[in-house]
Amino acid sequence: MVSVFLSTLLLAAATVQAYLPAQQIDVQSSLLSDPSKVAGKTYDYIIAGGGLTGLTVAAKLTENPKIKVLVIEKGFYESNDGAIIEDPNAYGQIFGTTVDQNYLTVPLINNRTNNIKAGKGLGGSTLINGDSWTRPDKVQIDSWEKVFGMEGWNWDSMFEYMKKAEAARAPTAAQLAAGHYFNATCHGTNGTVQSGARDNGQPWSPIMKALMNTVSALGVPVQQDFLCGHPRGVSMIMNNVDENQVRVDAARAWLLPSYQRPNLEILTGQMVGKVLFKQTASGPQAVGVNFGTNKAVNFDVFAKHEVLLAAGSAISPLILEYSGIGLKSVLDQANVTQLLDLPVGINMQDQTTTTVSSRASAAGAGQGQAVFFANFTETFGDYAPQARELLNTKLDQWAEETVARGGFHNVTALKVQYENYRNWLLDEDVAFAELFMDTEGKINFDLWDLIPFTRGSVHILSSDPYLWQFANDPKFFLNEFDLLGQAAASKLARDLTSQGAMKEYFAGETLPGYNLVENATLSQWSDYVLQNFRPNWHAVSSCSMMSRELGGVVDATAKVYGTQGLRVIDGSIPPTQVSSHVMTIFYGMALKVADAILDDYAKSA
């Protein structure tokens, strides 16, 4: 009788555990925080950074029980820290907390500094971002192979990997009626990362449909699925949320199913400072990393096969530079002996954001978000001839100016990038600007120029990785076309807010409001943008994946040129910006790189 009772009790407990929300699982206590537990040990792979790509690759590698992986993360397991992370509607509330790296830029245009938001904790920036789920244009990914020489990096290949990551939920009838659209052929359903419509249970605002009707009258397509390879027009978008409307960050998606594997160890509260090498006849070979918290307290740990850098576009370049890989001028200034000459930390491309916001009438009440991916002509409107003239006459000048400012190192190679972007905008109908509209008592557009011509940099300033001294310099708006594009997109948002079907719900502008005259010129908008922009926090390309001749740091398998056993596997490697939010790309990229790593492992076994 006691045995039956105990069995029943255990079954009930197991059932309760199965239905407990993920946020109640005590993951951190199962992870490592004592560095002495791993110091001096040898693993097959060491991953520096437990963000989106780091956790994805760790999970894929450790599916093979023979492969032993160590992930070293500066932060901790934060996914169970309440609504500030779990609730996608709480976006922005986490900024400035211990989960936000909050890097400070060098003084930029108008002598302004800006904060760069990036996640600190297992899950990385998926803990703090807006969890938007879109994909780029086919021609953008195809250019990685056709223009930059990265064999296998084309839309068809990446599309399959991106779908492989995804577990999509189709919209409900009510969500479809509100303005969602879903093309099942463009989605995966058997992946790990859940995606679906954001829905707080409140009535839907009619403003999304009003925006669609307004732009449709102008010839713009509406209700598109922005995951099919040509994002243009207006639609509602998907988000990384589960069926309970809880954020599905990378820790929930990849760590929760894998953290108890005996061949996976996660060390938290420590940062990787530099890569350890031994010299071989074939060049420097990565054999481990030095990690810790300060110059006096740090440790070595060793890798039998590879070191994988996944610390993000702002930090992975710094780890390379601290390790002696980078431009000689940068390393000399920081008193680091150069091991290998590569253009690390340059070509960094981030976008800029401004906001146009208005009050909504009572008739516009309700929840909802919609996105307008506008092409070149739609963004610039009457100013399109002026913008086209710049693209057709200024590329040489821009390339020379960018190299002179330290944003890139080779004028000829940079012009290849610029010509690629010009082709996208003028010949391929690629989305140039994103206007992200949020409702609930307002008509709020956050908007950004998706395709920047500015090139920034991030470099170390000392030889001590634990002093955290570096210069993050996005060089925003040092290219005239970027400023013109941001101004035009801002003007477009204001124009749309109070015209066509949107008029019914417009109840007065709050931003820019009285700070900018009603019929402002593009020049006046440019002045406003310079005083009121913020970074978009989508930086890529600081360790570019392209041919070495064009300025690449890593090859098509993410291996650092001139080394053995070292890859960069994060958002610093895409060679271009894209007309999309970046999570889908990073997940697909991580799965593709994981396969390349496993292929090499199989050959070495």
Curated annotation (Swiss-Prot):
It comes from Talaromyces flavus. GO terms for molecular function: beta-D-glucose oxidase activity; flavin adenine dinucleotide binding. Belongs to the GMC oxidoreductase family. Induction: Expression is induced in the presence of glucose but not xylose. PROSITE patterns: GMC_OXRED_1, GMC_OXRED_2. The keyword Secreted applies. This is Glucose oxidase. Homodimer. Disulfide bonds join C186-C228. Pfam families: GMC_oxred_C (PF05199), GMC_oxred_N (PF00732). FAD binds at L52, T53, E73, S125, N129, G130, S132, V272, G571, M583. The gene is GOX. InterPro entries: FAD/NAD-bd_sf, Glucose_Oxidase_domain_2, GMC_OxRdtase, GMC_OxRdtase_N, GMC_OxRtase_C. SUPFAM superfamilies: FAD-linked reductases, C-terminal domain (SSF54373), FAD/NAD(P)-binding domain (SSF51905). O2 binds at K559, V560. GO terms for cellular component: cytoplasmic vesicle; extracellular region. Glucose oxidase catalyzes the oxidation of beta-D-glucose to D-glucono-delta-lactone and hydrogen peroxide in the presence of molecular oxygen. D-glucono-delta-lactone is sequentially hydrolyzed by lactonase to D-gluconic acid, and the resulting hydrogen peroxide is hydrolyzed by catalase to oxygen and water. Glucose oxidase alone indirectly causes toxicity in the presence of glucose and is the active compound of the antifungal antibiotic talaron. Responsible for inhibition of germination of microsclerotia of Verticillium dahliae. GO terms for biological process: secondary metabolite biosynthetic process. Glucose oxidase activity in culture filtrates of T.flavus is extremely stable and culture filtrates retain 13.2% of their original glucose oxidase activity after 14 days of incubation at 25 degrees Celsius. Glucose oxidase is also stable at elevated temperatures. After 5 days of incubation at 30, 45, or 50 degrees Celsius, culture filtrates retains 41.0, 44.0, and 28.7% original glucose oxidase activity, respectively. After 9 days of incubation at 45 or 50 degrees Celsius, culture filtrates retains 30.0 and 4.7% original glucose oxidase activity, respectively. It is an enzyme of class 1 (oxidoreductase).
